[in-house]
Amino acid sequence: MIDNDRFRTENIGRHLLGFHDVSQNKVEAVANYLRSIRPEREVETYSDDFQNVFENCNEKLNTCSALFLCTGDAMTEKFVIDAFHSDNMKQPTFILWLEPFGIAGHLVYINPMQMPKNFVLYKDKGSMLYKYNLLAPIEYEINADRFTKKDAGCNGEYALYSGNDVTLMLSAFYPYINKLIQQPEQSKCYRWVGNIKLAQEKGFKLTIEVSSTTIGHVEELPL
């Protein structure tokens, strides 16, 4: 596990950890949580930026069976994609994140052995908005302050969604992740439909017609 952040009170509503873990390094606290459930489990942690760990421990990282990138940070995701394009990333990678308010969840599966050349995930380099977002691009432009909340005492910010949204998304994606780990396939994307009724209530524009889908639906899309 790699993360240079510390656990804060505002993280509690959507995390495995609780009040007794506040101010601890997230990776160390999560590692202790996992060991408390499975003492025999081997958990290795890095309290650092992914970019630094990749540069300093690239050989070791590339021995892993898969990489799960769950930062929600576009620059880290771009770093990983650039590493694929330059042939420096060798292991299958799963990129997961939720859109604000849990309106949609996304899974990008990249298999370095079966991926299109020079693939892109974003509509354009300027906005760095994912090409399969359910929220319309204009909503990210005009509602940026409504979609994120700043961490108290630091310069970071995070999208608004609940722990329940995370559980629902992961439950929907798990069968696909398990299958792809066991039987690697062509690189692809998946989109989980979440709180679209909430999007309607708040008047948010979507990139699809609500009548064309259902809550909980998982759609496979090309990388």
What are the functions of these language-model segments?
Residues 2-4, 96:
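The conserved SAM/SAH-binding core of class I Rossmann-like methyltransferase domains
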Residues 4-41:
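Glycine-rich phosphate-binding loop and adjoining beta1-alpha1-beta2 segment
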Residues 12, 50, 98:
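Hydrophobic pocket-lining residues within nucleotide cofactor-binding pockets
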Residues 15-16, 59, 109-110:
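Short low-complexity, flexible loop/linker segments enriched in glycine and/or proline
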Residues 32-57:
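S-adenosyl-L-methionine
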Residues 49, 71-72:
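Short beta->alpha linker loops
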Residues 62-66, 72-223:
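Glycine-rich phosphate/adenylate-binding loop
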